Amino acid sequence: PLGDVHGRVVGQLRSVHARGVEGCRTMYGARGFVCHHNTDIWGDCAPQDRVVPATLWPMGGAWLCLHIIEHYRYSQDEDFIEGYFDILRDAVLFFMDTMVKDAQGYWITGPSVSPENTYRTENGETGSLCMGPTMDAQILRQLFAGYLMICKDLSANDELARQVHEHLEH
């Protein structure tokens, strides 16, 4: 069943988290954990390969954490979520430390990429790195909303939850 496979993906987050905490600190000087576009059975989280339209994507950890949120959303298993809350919280912390406000006052990620996508500038040059790709915003909206839902259920509302709420509002 799909649930069995899902459990293995969520279980893999333990090794990804351990390596991603170190990568977050050394690469970004930030709290939390980060996983880029690729990982493996050893939990490697650093950017890999030479394909710029995918390599630098820092959303892998957040995307994987959506599995934690979905599992909890449909199971309401508090033992499960208490066992993974540290990973979810660390994924959120990374973005609290690294997001910046754009000219319109919105919180955005960057530099990032929209995996395997390139854009063309007005003068015809192509690029991949950008600020605030839509895919990042969609993943973070789900991550942040899920985090707040779980904080409410666990009565774990704190300063981080307040910051997350502010980021969702702006």
Language-model segments: residues:
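Carboxylate/His-rich catalytic cores and anion/metal-binding grooves
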Residues: 1-36
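Aromatic- and glycine-enriched glycan-recognition loops and surfaces
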Residues: 82-86
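Glycine-rich phosphate/pyrophosphate-binding loop
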Residues: 167-170
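Alpha-helical scaffold segments in carbohydrate-active enzymes
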Residues: 12-15, 19, 87-101, 146
